[in-house]
Amino acid sequence: MIHDTIIIGAGPGGLTAGIYAMRGKLNALCIEKENAGGRIAEAGIVENYPGFEEIRGYELAEKFKNHAEKFKLPIIYDEVIKIETKERPFKVITKNSEYLTKTIVIATGTKPKKLGLNEDKFIGRGISYCTMCDAFFYLNKEVIVIGRDTPAIMSAINLKDIAKKVIVITDKSELKAAESIMLDKLKEANNVEIIYNAKPLEIVGEERAEGVKISVNGKEEIIKADGIFISLGHVPNTEFLKDSGIELDKKGFIKTDENCRTNIDGIYAVGDVRGGVMQVAKAVGDGCVAMANIIKYLQKL
């Protein structure tokens, strides 16, 4: 079988593309590595998506998934490891199968950026990248957030009403937020401490993470806590595009034009994976734009 389009990733952008594909009567398939709905499920309260004055991230993710299922978008849970673009139709190779398609929408999003110290051995044992996933393990306990700007601010906001104390460690002289209201919320919290100009040196602990060694103006000290959340932002999920011929920028994000087209005719990228502003509203718009252009493209074949 040759699909009209294959959508790689079932976040807001991918599912929007899928909805438009099904409404356009395309033979579409969506392939998702983890959970349909995307990384928005990890968010706390979402207040900037039109139509919902206030909604929890996981609830919004579920609504996206349900909407796509209403239009019977087929979603297969598998990991895409390679796409072959030299011949038509394109070939999408997963861990468990191979698929042929006339067009592709890449909506693989991003993943947490690592600290680059010794944190890997403590993941699940005091180290986490997801406040919404793991915050309640630290009810009335002390936690550390290591990060910068909006990611660190969001994590601290998610934790401040759960943890006894939140210590934000940043290597910057100030924190900047994508929306000033977020910074206001953080400053209003009386259980949040911010340590500026602090360079993390090492995660300390034996069986589990117990704190972090930092250097502030050349002076080293150890900050103790029950848990540590790393919030340094995200990097694109584009490793599988190696040797695909699809152009990436120096940070690994997919290069596209204003219509979400890549340098290869028939292949599009939507949402966070193409960089720029990383917001649900933008990803949804990208999904709409990409699939509208794919429908036009297919009509000309």
Swiss-Prot record:
Cofactor: FAD
Superkingdom in the source lineage: Archaea
Organism (species): Methanocaldococcus jannaschii (strain ATCC 43067 / DSM 2661 / JAL-1 / JCM 10045 / NBRC 100440) (Methanococcus jannaschii)
Any GO BP annotation: removal of superoxide radicals
Disulfide bonds: C130-C133
Catalytic reaction equation(s): [thioredoxin]-dithiol + NADP(+) = [thioredoxin]-disulfide + NADPH + H(+)
Subunit annotation: Homodimer.
Keyword Coiled coil on entry: no
Keywords: Cytoplasm, Disulfide bond, FAD, Flavoprotein, NADP, Oxidoreductase, Redox-active center
Subcellular compartments: Cytoplasm
Alphabetized GO MF terms: thioredoxin-disulfide reductase (NADPH) activity
EC number: 1.8.1.9
Other remarks on this protein: The active site is a redox-active disulfide bond.
InterPro entries: FAD/NAD-bd_sf, FAD/NAD-binding_dom, Ferredoxin-NADP_redctase_2, Pyr_nucl-diS_OxRdtase_2_AS, Thioredox_Rdtase
Family statement: Belongs to the class-II pyridine nucleotide-disulfide oxidoreductase family.
UniProt-recorded name of the protein: Putative thioredoxin reductase
Enzyme class: oxidoreductase
Cofactor binding, note field: Binds 1 FAD per subunit.
One Gene Ontology CC term in the entry: cytoplasm
Pfam families (UniProt xref): Pyr_redox_2
Binding-site residues for FAD, renumbered to this chain: 32-39, 272-280
